[in-house]
A protein has these predicted regions:
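ATP-dependent carboxylate-amine ligase catalytic core
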Residues: 2-110, 118-142, 150-157
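Phosphate-binding active sites in nucleotide-utilizing proteins
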Residues: 241-305, 309-314
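Cysteine-nucleophile active-site neighborhood
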Residues: 294-372
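A short, charged/proline- and glycine-enriched loop
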Residues: 1-2, 236-242
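C-terminal and late-domain segments of enzyme folds
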Residues: 107, 212-213, 237-239, 251-261, ...
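Beta-strand->loop->alpha-helix junctions that form or flank phosphate-binding loops
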Residues: 37-38, 171-179, 268-276
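Internal gly/pro-rich beta-alpha loop/helix module
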Residues: 124-235
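A short helix->loop->beta-strand "cap" motif at the edges of active sites that frequently abuts
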Residues: 112, 169, 316-320
Length: 452
């Protein structure tokens, strides 16, 4: 099985473009690939899934223990013919000024070879020096080959012998610049897959170009590894409760692994759209409002008053609810759109969502619960991450968050039926799915007792 990590010296090198092109090309070659993304990013896995339906998941060495990452990899890679893991940021760049949760740490944890994506613009011999530095920075870098991105055929033919001689690494090919296949960006990184016109056509052009300019035989020889040992599937519970999950263009940041954990815990997930639907699904015993871009759809969310009222009444009535980041903003009083206009929201929580114009409390942190609640026990902590350009006038204070000795804050609203806050939670390997489903089951029993 071909298994490898796509990494680069720095952000903006075209890792996602190359990864999507590779996945599409592997799919064309009948390899049935699956993809992983290093780190907490939501958008890149959405892109991976848009490439001819390729399965994609997150692997995060900050949010998850090494054994959990290995088990997730083995579980989701099973049955596929190739695995492509896309790194984040620069190869060694992790949490703070460390390699923790970096693409290198993921490659090291999984013992996978690395294909280094390099943009050669403005350098030649210096590229060799930079690559040498990356190779020798750690005793085992796992770097096995080089791919040139945004490179002409003429430049490739000049650089290939130079780089191979100076680094000892094979240069496997290049991806030429294709102006007709450019993917635009957004404030969380790349735009979401559903927003880009002719996405399939653009990725098809990239795949064709890469397939024609890649040494597939060498790539296969460098990346062939035994398939990971299968992991016994977790025992499925049968709680018999329905949990409504918001899923549309405003709420699109839910980890596939989190949803799988909820299913394993016994929940039946029912998807709905706070933008388009007029009311919540029937017979639900829980509500999950993940993150996304509600600020970009504040007007249609606000104008859908029947849905706002339904959610407000349900949450205030004790429906077990989890609202992360964008979902948290939706539960507030108002939410400013990109122009600064404030639109009424569900009105469950006291804060107002406001545009800040810069990243707010960005990155990984450690969150500790102050009291028992739907998802947490008092004193329990969880690794979390935040990434948002909007803030709230009231972020809550039911959790303590520690980022460093100098950077700490309080946030979140928690009760025996609610978690709401900016922090994104990663549920895998934690008791959170079981507790959420248990809360839904308790709510279901209460409803039945009330109706009897």
């Amino acid at each position: 099985m071909m298994q490898f990590v796509i990494a680069a010296p720095r952000s903006g090198s075209g890792k996602t473009t190359v990864t999507c092109a590779l996945l599409a090309a592997l799919k064309k070659r009948g390899m049935d690939p699956c993809a992983f993304k290093s780190g907490p990013d939501y958008i890149d896995p959405m892109f991976h899934r848009s490439v001819l339906g390729v399965e994609s998941h997150n692997l995060d060495r900050y949010l998850s223990a090494k054994n959990t990452v290995r088990e997730l990899y083995a579980h989701y890679a099973a049955g596929h013919g190739a695995v492509v893991c896309e790194g984040a940021m620069g190869f060694y760049d992790g949490q703070g000024l460390t390699t923790r949760a970096s693409a290198w740490e993921l490659a090291d944890a999984l013992d996978l070879p690395v294909l280094l994506v390099v943009q050669p613009k403005g350098a030649s011999v210096t590229l060799a020096a930079e690559i040498q530095g990356l190779v020798h920075f750690k005793p085992e870098s796992h770097i096995a080959g080089i791919l040139l991105n945004d490179c002409s055929e003429k430049l490739f033919r000049m650089l290939k012998p130079l780089l191979e001689t100076e680094t000892g690494l094979p240069v496997l090919g290049y991806l030429p610049r294709l102006p007709q296949a450019v993917v635009e960006s957004r404030h969380l990184g790349l735009k979401t897959a559903g927003e880009i016109t002719d996405l399939a056509q653009k990725i098809g052009l990239l795949a064709d170009a890469l397939e024609a300019n890649l040494d597939w035989a060498t790539l296969e020889a460098l990346t062939e590894r035994p398939a990971p040992a299968p992991v016994p599937p977790p025992a499925l519970q049968t709680a018999g409760v329905r949990i409504a999950v918001a899923q549309d263009k405003a709420f699109c940041f839910a980890y596939a692994e989190t949803l799988d954990c909820l299913r394993t815990a016994g929940a039946e997930l029912v998807f709905f759209s706070p933008v388009h639907d007029t009311t919540l699904p029937e017979d639900i015993c829980g509500l999950y409002l993940p993150g996304g871009y509600p600020e970009l759809y504040a007007r249609p969310l606000s104008e859908n008053k029947t849905m706002r009222d339904a959610i407000r009444d349900a949450v205030n009535g004790g429906l077990p609810t989890v609202a992360e980041c964008g979902g948290f903003l939706y539960l507030g009083q108002t939410l400013e759109d990109a122009s600064g206009t404030a639109w009424p929201m569900a009105g469950v929580l006291p804060g107002k969502g406001v545009k800040v114009g810069r990243l707010v409390r960005f990155g990984y942190a450690d969150m500790t619960a102050k009291a028992d609640s739907l998802l947490f026990h008092a004193g329990e902590h969880l690794y979390i991450h935040e990434f948002h350009h909007w803030d709230s006038t009231d972020n809550g204070s039911d959790f303590s968050v520690w980022k460093s000795e100098k950077v700490q804050w309080e946030c979140g609203f928690a009760s025996m039926s609610l978690y709401a806050g900016f922090p994104h939670l990663y549920w895998v390997g934690t008791p959170l799915p079981r507790r959420f489903v248990s809360g839904a089951k308790f709510y279901q029993r209460q409803k039945r007792n009330t109706h009897d």
